Amino acid sequence: MSRYDPAATESRWQAAWDEAGVFTARHDPSRPKYYVLEMFPYPSGRIHMGHVRNYTMGDVVARQKAAAGYSVLHPMGWDAFGMPAENAAMERGGHPKDWTYGNIADMRAQMKPLGLSIDWSREFATCDPEYYGQQQAMFIDMLEAGLIYRKNAVVNWDPVDMTVLANEQVIDGKGWRSNAPVERRELTQWFFRISDYAGELLEALDRLKDWPEKVRLMQANWIGQSRGLQFAFSTVNAPEGFDRLEVYTTRPDTLLGASFAAISPDHPLAKHLERHDAGVAEFVAECRRVGTSEEALEKAEKKGFDTGIRVRHPFDTALELPVYIANFILMDYGTGAIFGCPAHDQRDFEFASKYGLPIPPVFVAEGTEEAPLTEAFVPMKSERVAYVRGFAGAEIQTGEEAVAAAIDFCESKGVGRGVTNYRLRDWGISRQRYWGCPIPVIHCETCGVVPEAKENLPVRLPDDVTFDVPGNPLDRHPTWRDCTCPKCGAKARRETDTMDTFVDSSWYYARFTAPRATTPTDPEEAEYWMNVDQYIGGIEHAILHLLYSRFFARAMQKTGHLPAKAIEPFNALFTQGMVTHEAYYSEEAKQEPVWQGMLEPGESPDTQMTVRHITYHFPEEVERTEDGAILKTTGQKLKVIPSTKMSKSKKNVVDPMNIISQFGADTARWFVMSDSPPERDVEWTASGAEAAFKHLGRVWRLADEIARAEGAPTAEDVALDRATAKAIAEVTQGIEGFAFNKAIAKLYEFTNTLSRSGAGAEAKRRAMRTMAQLMSPMVPHLAEEVWSMLGGEGLVAQAPWPKADPALLVDDMVTLPIQINGKRRAEVTVPKDMAASEVEKLVLADEAVQRALSGGAPKKLIVVPGRIVNVVI
């Protein structure tokens, strides 16, 4: 008997698929189409088990849909621009282009052995000039359509690397790479008008029925719709031109609890004061050393500077509130100015307590009296409270009712107007980096900002750049930077900022429909292939990537690059769980000198401190024991961290190439699909991989045995046909419902049924061929081997998906338990319509019943049709 040897067979079938062009996507109007797409990877150079799981999921769907008669598009590309390539060039020498394309080649070589049903003819990288040139063409179209504009904006500036940092790249107020204190600097930036679509993007979430509820909620919260009041305080002692201070509040019902007003350090009033007051200038400079994100401001100590300016309360002009510049107010939300109600906002409470400001409560819990507060009272808006300083609505009402009543009251009195605001800000895309898509505009002293002529696209990145000096190499590349104005022909300068890499990934799904087109999309191909029917990726992309893609589809539709039906580009979204693994580490305590800044007064500079040094170890260096783990080389006992996300830092990574080399691609695919529901994390274990390999070997041996079997039909043929029909129905349901683990569980069960069946040889071969078809999406190489062994025609990858005979799904057999003197002793399976007298004969012939009777006859034998048989001795 031959043995299961994936190393000898898997590459052969991959070559056969390539030769037959099995996975080439074909525009075929006579067939329904299905577009399945996994979020394309960043070319880091190595694939990991998370990639294996993600792309196997998409592959299972793509293969099953192709077998079911769909024309399938299942492409692959590379999200290839970005900082890591540029940082690699700085740290190791070389060029980002070489580093990126080298990594792409490495990852492609690692992915192909997985046997994915990808149409590699459509492959592209976002750093290909053919791709980013079309992106530049769309930029110009969107600029002319008013979807893009330029303005000054406050950004995180790294003074060492001389670049803008994203909020997440600012760690404890310092640049993630340079460790230099970050500055808030105002720069001219390019923006997409995504905020114009905030209401539409929010409202349309309700129509995305096949998206996870969690993702829709995360996007809704990010868009952040709020209903509030915008009004103006009149000012006292303010500079000329600042006689009013516009504020926006979502809690106008708390106006009578206001004890101060606060403005952003970037507010026009703060900027005016900064130019004329050294104290203000010093405070604003301190504020600018904090990142620009809400998270950074939330973590920072709340500080304020009393400007000496006062504002009059709109309902009591005798009451004047101090105006502070506060480090926690964002200029780009609302008006950049707020009033503080410390009794009902914890941040305002801490601020008022710090600066000795009044804390008058506006409402109290229902049934309680007004009392001094030790912390802010912040009930849910839906909770009923008693208003002690209310001015609109009932005395006892919910916060929601009170806000609506307050807006109506204020509007009736001419104090402001009700406004719907959104947390979503316009999307700033300017990056002071080399390795990105150049922004295709030219700055001319005569004509101003001029788009590059489309016939000159792509504006290619120059190759002759160096990274030995901080900052953007494009700024110091005169032969690239200096150009002529396409409008007047005068000397001009190119825009040296490049686009945020999120732009690259916001439309790649559309480019896959016609990746070689000389326009961003081909109308005919986009009409046929769009939308993406099934999108697969991690929950970490729930907000930015998916939200930007939804906006971009609208912008592309407005500029004629996508059909109206593609305004929501992804019909269904699935967010898969992670692949996890135990982590192993050893620790050692060492005595080291105390850092000088930590020494107590009078303490010796030679003072030592105990420092724990932790060393992580790769799984292949570790041997598991009954009570833990040891290091193979030394026997040292190790600490074990329960299964956690695979990461290079913890060294708990499993190299897919090692798994493929040891067990084959099908084992890796089977295991990551079988052990857990796909939306949950799956723990990778060596024992689990070995068990998967053993099962696939068992399937191989079973197929080999059945292929060589001989024998006439038997009475069990029909039962096996029924089991086959059920397997078809349940595996199909599992795949279509993204319950891959349930589909695989059914295949385990079907294997057991087939191995135990006493059916005839031809019935078994028929069932085994069906098994090959059913397991083909999960383990395509083994499926081809089994299909070939059993005489299947052509490739199983091209065979139509099996259909269950409805008649065989109707179970006309019933299993009746046999009770002897009230205790269950046996069972008998009979046709549902079998006569009771015939059932009695089968029961009396049962071995367990015969042993109990010891040659005698039962006192009673009662058959309850379809339910039970009672034997009384």
Swiss-Prot record:
GO MF term list: aminoacyl-tRNA deacylase activity; ATP binding; leucine-tRNA ligase activity
Residue interval(s) of motif 'KMSKS' region: 645-649
UniProt-listed Pfam families: Anticodon_1 (PF08264), tRNA-synt_1 (PF00133), tRNA-synt_1_2 (PF13603), tRNA-synt_1g (PF09334)
Alphabetized UniProt keyword annotations: Aminoacyl-tRNA synthetase, ATP-binding, Cytoplasm, Ligase, Nucleotide-binding, Protein biosynthesis
SUPFAM superfamilies for this protein: Anticodon-binding domain of a subclass of class I aminoacyl-tRNA synthetases, Nucleotidylyl transferase, ValRS/IleRS/LeuRS editing domain
Subcellular location: Cytoplasm
Gene Ontology CC: cytosol
EC number assigned by the record: 6.1.1.4
Annotated InterPro entries: aa-tRNA-synth_I_CS, aa-tRNA-synth_Ia, Leu-tRNA-ligase, Leu_tRNA-synth_edit, M/V/L/I-tRNA-synth_anticd-bd, Methionyl/Leucyl_tRNA_Synth, Rossmann-like_a/b/a_fold, tRNAsynth_Ia_anticodon-bd
Protein biosynthesis as UniProt keyword: yes
PANTHER family named among the record's database cross-references: LEUCINE--TRNA LIGASE, MITOCHONDRIAL, LEUCYL-TRNA SYNTHETASE
Name the record gives this protein: Leucine--tRNA ligase
Native source species: Cereibacter sphaeroides (strain ATCC 17025 / ATH 2.4.3) (Rhodobacter sphaeroides)
Organism placement in taxonomy: Bacteria, Pseudomonadati, Pseudomonadota, Alphaproteobacteria, Rhodobacterales
